[in-house]
From Swiss-Prot:
It is found in: Mitochondrion inner membrane. GO terms for cellular component: mitochondrial inner membrane; respiratory chain complex I. It comes from Dasyurus hallucatus. Belongs to the complex I subunit 4L family. It comes from the Eukaryota. Core subunit of the mitochondrial membrane respiratory chain NADH dehydrogenase (Complex I) which catalyzes electron transfer from NADH through the respiratory chain, using ubiquinone as an electron acceptor. Part of the enzyme membrane arm which is embedded in the lipid bilayer and involved in proton translocation. Coiled coil: none annotated. Keywords: Electron transport, Membrane, Mitochondrion, Mitochondrion inner membrane, NAD, Respiratory chain, Translocase, Transmembrane, Transmembrane helix, Transport, Ubiquinone. PANTHER family: NADH-UBIQUINONE OXIDOREDUCTASE CHAIN 4L (PTHR11434:SF0), NADH-UBIQUINONE OXIDOREDUCTASE SUBUNIT ND4L (PTHR11434). This is NADH-ubiquinone oxidoreductase chain 4L. Its main location: mitochondrion. It is a multi-pass membrane protein. GO terms for molecular function: NADH dehydrogenase (ubiquinone) activity. Its EC number is 7.1.1.2.
């Protein structure tokens, strides 16, 4: 169990590092955020089963729902930005400009 938790923690940290390194492209940032959410979902599920906290069994499902909503909003934002600006560079965006 310890090796699985360590692997999932390393996967979460790698995805977090990817968010910090690839923050200039929106698509790469969204993929790294999805990796973070997936590793967090699996880690929460394994910890709940391991410690027999069945009262918290809905928490991973709620996290998965929010992750799906985040992915949908992120992809809609990516499509909108790509159609208006022609690329997904976050550096070229000025959010104060309408």
């Amino acid at each position: 169990m310890l090796a699985i938790n360590l692997n999932l923690t390393v996967a979460f940290m790698l995805a977090l590092t990817g968010v910090l390194v690839y923050r200039s492209h929106l698509m790469s940032t969204l993929l790294c955020l999805e990796g973070m959410m997936l590793s967090l979902f699996i880690l929460m599920t394994l910890l709940i089963v391991h410690f027999h906290m069945f009262s918290m069994s809905m928490a991973p499902l709620i996290l998965l729902v929010f992750s799906a909503c985040e992915a949908g909003v992120g992809l809609a934002l990516l499509v909108k930005i790509s159609s208006t600006h022609g690329n997904d560079y976050v550096q070229n965006l000025n959010l104060l400009q309408c």
